[in-house]
Amino acid sequence: LDGVADKFDNIIIDEAHGFRNETTATYEKLSEICRGKRVILVTATPYNNTPKDILSLLKLFQKPRKSDIPNLPDLESFFGGLEKNLRKLDRKKNYEEYMDVTKSNAKEVREKVLKHLMVRRTRTEIKKYFGEDLKNQGLSFPDVAKPIPLFYQLNEKEDKIFTETIGLIASEFTYARYMPMTYYTGEFDQSEIQGQKNMGRFMKILLVKRLESSFHAFKQSVDRFLNTYEIFIKEFNNGNVYTSKKHTSKVFQFLENDDDGAVQRLIDDDKAERYDGKNFTKEFLRDLEHDRELLITIKELWKGMDRDPKLLTFIEQLSTDETLKKNHIIIFTESKETAGYLFENIDKHFPGEVLRFDGSSHASDRDKVIRNFDAKSKNKESNYRILVTTEVLSEGVNLHRSNVVINYDIPWNPTRLMQRVGRINRVDTKHKTIHTYNFFPSVQGDSHIALKSAAEMKIAAFLSLLGDDAELLTEGEPVDSHALFERLTSSEAIDGEGEEDSELRYLKVIEDIRENDSDLFEIIKQLPRK
């Protein structure tokens, strides 16, 4: 792009929420491109985790210390104050107050910042004020059915092992192998220490997500964790500790795709610096060996777990549910290994109908996805009816030949659910209704209420045992177990609506005046803007 940006005055950034993190090299490059330009950001989810999400986007076209937003020249101070309000509270101990402050912050941002900068359009408003235009163009929005929860029921033995494992990986495991510098006795860089602490937290979340994703993916991850611990301890006993600052910046990309195999390789291969094992506290080896024994314990616990209640429930649902039997289906999972596992098992029951696409797929596979699942594809095919995919297809690709999304993992952040369903929830779809199914772990029960209650308890166990680290699981969104379950089983989580009307109704009034009373419209045009 060097030199190309100089030829343009206007920059339009689609899926702008992908640039909420200003510490990345991509953001830095985009910031250079936008400098001195007119910038338009297009996104369905501008605010996801914290108020600073918005600030990062604003910096692409506003000077943070000298903005032109009315009565708000210093954006850094404004957003810093909002962040400070949250940092004073412990989300776990002061949950209600934390939620109140979160809502208050969102209102402040909306009233003092976004109303001056954002043009917001919801489908409800467009149907209300531009229904005639839609009709004339032969367009319509599909109805969004209430998401259907699918409960996979753990038997007594499975439930015991599942619950015990959550406790072990969330509370007992130290993740010492991923943060060696926290045990170092020599001089160190504080930023490196913090980076490794974050690494430990993210590896914890990765294991938790794997456990909920599929028993298969979890077992594979435990094997890899155990292998990397064995190698690390062997090197430590030889007097060597290898670590590097380099991998910490890249690892988040792999974690985003839940590719822990790539994370392990990155950490193991990037042995840029060697430290003498003598310069680490005795607690380091103790914790390393403790974690290794814990991994062996977990592996033994799961050795006899051959039944997969989640997969069994899914295959039965695919075979008996009329909506799933007759429509194109998109199955989302955050784990590449779960995607492969699902593909192999679903293909046994529906041979030749299943296509898999993840981060390791080739460009030709992407073309297959488009030809079979994009309703507007110029080279439409009907070779596949079921698509198993990861987050790589949650944005940027239209899949609206399908009207069904199945979330095989819990979408811990409801924003992700909206993005996934957005692939099929298009204005030009030929389907009348959009369907969503979400999986939840539960225990054997004889009623929907009992299953729902048990599922909420499972979610609560994840969030409670993770404590402050739960914010990494939900990607910063503060939710409790009941609220999360309710949001994931409501249509609002899919269409993203539920807030107050925007200014569209007033613009519609002005438009009507322009069309029907030109004299009054000329008078309005002469009115001062403020």
Task: Go through the PLM ranges and name each one.
Residues E334-R356:
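Conserved helicase motor "Helicase C" RecA-like lobe of SF1/SF2 P-loop NTPases
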Residues D53-S56, V397-D409, H435-N438:
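A short beta-strand element within the Helicase C-terminal
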Residues S360-T389:
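Conserved helicase ATPase core of P-loop NTP-dependent helicases/translocases
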Residues P414-H431:
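Conserved SF2 helicase motif VI
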Residues N10, Y27-K128, M199-M203, T433-T436, ...:
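Conserved P-loop NTPase motor "coupling/switch" region that bridges the ATPase
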Residues I40, N94-H290, H482-S518:
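Inter-lobe connector of SF1/SF2 helicase motors
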Residues N49-P51, G340, E381-S382, L387-S402, ...:
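SF2 helicase motor core recognition
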Residues I126, T429-K530:
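C-terminal accessory region of SF2 helicases/translocases
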